[in-house]
Amino acid sequence: MQIEDRYITGWCDQCWEHFNRSIGQYKRYYKYAKIGITIDYRVRASQHERREKKYKWERMIVLYKTTSENNANYVEGYYQDRDDFVNKWYGWSHMSPTGEYYVYLLLGNHKYRRKK
C-alpha cells in the first residue's frame, strides 16, 4: 500500500474546506474509500491490508494530525456515516491518553486501470 503524508494541522473547524476538497479529488478515482483514525498510520495500513482484502486497498492518504482525540474523532465521525464510504465500525476510539492522532483516507480498487 502506498502511504502519503499529506496532513495538515490546526483546529478541525478551520480544515473542512481542505478535507472536503482533498477527499473529493482522491475518491473519484477509486471504487472504495474509508476514513479512519490512528496513532500509528503505518501499522494501521498493514492491518487494513491483511484484514480487508476484498477492498484491495492501494493508498492511504494521511489528511490530519492533531493532539486532540476529540478533534480526530469528530473529523472521522463527520465522514464515516456517508454512503460513499465503507466504514463498518461506529463509535469513538480511545487509543492513547496522550500523543498524536492521525485521520486517514483509504482508497481501494482503482476505477481507471490502464490495460497493458
Short names for language-model regions:
Residues 1-85, 95-116:
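GIY-YIG nuclease catalytic motif and its immediate N-terminal context
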Residues 88-91:
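Conserved phosphate- and dinucleotide-binding cores of soluble alpha/beta proteins
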